[in-house]
Design a protein with these regions (language model features):
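Sequence-structural signature of the catalytic-core scaffold of metal-dependent phosphohydrolases
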Residues: 1-35, 42-85, 94, 98-153
């Protein structure tokens, strides 16, 4: 278990070692250099939120949502919880420079979601298949559709 200090949500507890390994991976670390708000920082000097910060915050909110659903006696296994957390952590891993501002300019007909899937598949190989469920949830191929809805909303 590790605790991160997030500028928006404060202390965020990371419960699973694989999530720490994914955060430390170069594919994820590159999100530190990609602005969440595209070119907005040129107009709003305080708009320096990165895709890295966004992904960590989104994962934190997913954990909160899962905790509440479990309190309401919605059945979510530990494997499903981890799968959803990884899916949302990596949901924007395919973003390129300046986020959405240049998305369709750099590679026509390919969205950041398409690139995210490619990178998730590559990470799945490196992590010996441990991202299978996360990819199913991300692609909306898992039986509990609400997990994908949490990722995509």
């Amino acid at each position: 278990m590790k605790i991160l200090n997030d500028p928006i949500y404060g202390f965020i507890t990371i419960r699973y070692p694989i999530i720490l390994n994914l955060i430390d991976h170069p594919y994820f670390q590159r999100l530190n250099r990609i602005k969440q708000l595209g070119l907005s920082y040129l107009v709003y000097p305080g708009a320096h939120h990165t895709r890295f910060h966004h992904a960590i915050g989104a994962m934190h909110l997913m954990q909160n949502a899962i905790d509440v659903l479990k309190l309401k006696e919605i059945e979510i296994s530990e494997e499903e919880e981890l799968g959803a957390l990884i899916a949302i952590l990596l949901h924007d891993i395919g973003h390129g420079p300046f986020s959405h501002a240049l998305e369709h300019t750099l590679v026509k007909g390919v969205s950041h979601e398409d690139i995210s899937i490619l990178l998730m598949n590559k990470l799945n190989e490196e992590f010996e298949g441990k991202l299978d469920l996360s990819i199913e949830i991300f692609r909306n191929n898992y039986k509990k559709k609400f997990l994908h809805q949490l990722v995509s909303s």
